[in-house]
Amino acid sequence: MDVPRTLLVTNDFPPRVGGIQRTLEALVKELPADRVGVFCPDWDEAEAYDAVAPFRMLRQPERFLWPTPAVRDRIEAAARAMDAEVVLFGATYPLALLGPRLAARGLPYLSAAHGFEYWLSIAPGTHALLRHATSRAARVPVLCSAFIARTVRTAVKGSVPVSVLYPGADVQRFRPDLQTQDIRERLRIGDRPLVVCVSRLVARKGQDTLIRAMPAIRSRVPGACLLIVGGGPDEERLRSMAGELPADVIAFSGQVKEEDLPRYYAAGDVFAMPCRTRLGGLEVEGWGNVFIEAAACAKPVVVGDSGGARESLVDGETGILVDGRRTQAVAEAVGDLLADPARARAMGLAGRQRVLDAHTWPDIAARLATWLHDAAPR
């Protein structure tokens, strides 16, 4: 794949954990390593990561980068050092606020958008930030959903092309034939029907609704249990809720290593994350790449209808779309799939095929490469 020399500027990159971090890493791994540099903050275990990274790592001493003149000067120096032809900001806020100045000095840029840019698009007083950051961008690739893209497009008022670039999954890592017996044994799940939820533990993701739904699910599917994978600020509250149920109903794995994550998806019979919109519409699920990773493992998905999450499945074919605010709806959807393994299996296989057809990283990176070429000087 031929691409112009590209400097990725981002606060979000491994070994820091998160969905944006994994998306950006997956994209740059598909680009020619000698054509890419990554300008990003320091993080725990960064030295070990950088030592084996195939692309150039330009690690900065701070833990978070703000759009200051000093950071702008360092970006320009890094771009000159690698003779970069284009800058890709991994997110619009905050670092793409430096983009117009870079463009004025002859360095074109793309400004990626995610769920947070939705908030910038609709929250009072923040439109100006978004419009300024993208005012001289060659393009805004929205690395989540058409829902977010529509909102961003309205906010920037047509001043820049806004295009959806749906994230994907590594189908060699996330696949259905992984060995998971040790996970089930260690968590004392055995061969019981298992619902898995992989996500950061925050209120929007809906783990609390899953916990509330488990008694109704178990009344239909005796022995069913729930595995919650991930960490976050809601963990104490969720563990307290789980403590009100029998000890064998809910298991928490905590944060798991990136290399182990596919096996946790594969360990389940159904994947569920009944995400919900909060704060009067200010907080939505921009996409939910966990649904794509679960589908790649041939798991049927139960998806909360918030923001762009509905775009991650074909309702009734690869999973079931639910109102994540309604415990009964979540219990019915999960219970239906656990009670009908043949239907669940068919949905899971359809989901994996959809990932193979439309959500593989090489194809996604090829679209990005086209936009980078369009932005680079002729």
Residue map of PLM features:
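A short helix/loop element that forms part of the nucleotide-sugar donor recognition site in Leloir-type
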Residues: R175-I189
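Nucleotide-activated donor-binding/catalytic signature segment of Leloir-type glycosyltransferases, i.e.
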Residues: E236-P262, V270
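A short, well-ordered alpha-helix in the C-terminal region of glycosyltransferases
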Residues: G223, A329, D336, R343-D357
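Conserved donor-binding/catalytic core segment of Leloir-type glycosyltransferases
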Residues: V9, I189-K205, I211-P215
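Short hydrophobic beta-strand element within catalytic cores of glycosyltransferases
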Residues: F291-A296, P300-V303, L313
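Acidic donor-binding loop of glycosyltransferase active sites
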Residues: A266-V284, K299
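Conserved acidic donor-binding segment of nucleotide-sugar-dependent glycosyltransferases
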Residues: V314-G316, I320-T327, D336-A342
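Short His-centered aromatic/hydrophobic patch
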Residues: F89-L95
